[in-house]
Amino acid sequence: MAVAEQGALAGLRERTEEGHLKAGRVPPSQVEHGRQSGAVKILEERPIDQSIRDYIPPLITEDEKLLRGHGARQPSDDFTRTDPWRVLRITSEFIEGFDTLAPVEKAVTVFGSARVGPDDAQYTAAQETARLLAEAGFAIMTGAGPGIMEAANKGARLGHGRSIGCNIELPFEQGTNPYVDTVINFRYFFVRKTMFIKYSSAFIIFPGGFGTLDELFEALTLIQTGKIYHFPVVMFGRHYWAGLIRWLHARVLQERKISPGDLELMLVTDDPAEAATAVIDAFEARSAAPRV
């Protein structure tokens, strides 16, 4: 290879590395180093209950860049790293999401743990629930990852429905599961959450962790405050959710932090058919309701 060509390639690699760093992602050289040193392999083979924070390098995410405090802007600062520029990037994510999902007439978003394997009963239940809904004409949306998300996307494909994944970009992300037909990548969690709410007719919440709970309580808050109507929230897994339901009754309701009717916003079930029927019935009621 000629010296000039070698120099051009080196410059291209340098710009690529810099671009990844500015975007808060792991640059290719570090990913390759991670593979050679075993770091990526360790991440892929970590115990299922091990915190991912133990394996991800402390890079700054796009959300953190937006939310953390900033000092006075210096004349030498790159404009593309300032908040006004981020507003444009956020707007572009909304536009891409709206444009991609505009043809979706009715969809259900399925949430749940990424740490559930194909042999787990929850995986099977999520797959079956999604299959029933897909056969009824619903698209299935997930966070595009493994576990419950993969099961739901697989069920959508088995039911010959549209399988949608809204992926979030993170360092050493695990990638999109193989059953997603339409994928949208987001830098910002709040943009992705808007897509879930805007294009879903219901949420089905399988057992999961903080992210799953976040989506659960945001949906309940939007219903409670009248922002959305005829929006079923199905919590799948009676045993898993029993402690939370008891706490809501014994503590939150008893101390009058919520109203008795707020506890009727959730359906708890172990039956995929019951979950699917609740969603279908609510959608039909919503469609029949007069437009204001």
Which residue stretches match the model-derived regions?
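Hydrophobic alpha-helical signal/anchor motif
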Residues: M1-V3, V26
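Short, intrinsically disordered low-complexity segments enriched in Ser/Thr with adjacent Pro
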Residues: G7-R13, E17-H20
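Glycine-rich beta-alpha loop segments
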Residues: G24, G34-C166, G175
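Solvent-exposed alpha-helices and their adjacent loops that cap or buttress functional pockets
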Residues: L101-P103, L132-A134, A156-R157, Q174-P178, ...
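Acidic/glycine-enriched connector segments
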Residues: G147-F206
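Short gly/pro/ser/thr-enriched loop/turn and capping motifs at secondary-structure boundaries
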Residues: E169-G175, T212, Y240-G243
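Active-site/ligand-binding-proximal alpha/beta "capping" segment
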Residues: R187-H239, F283-A288
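C-terminal functional extensions of proteins
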Residues: M235-V292
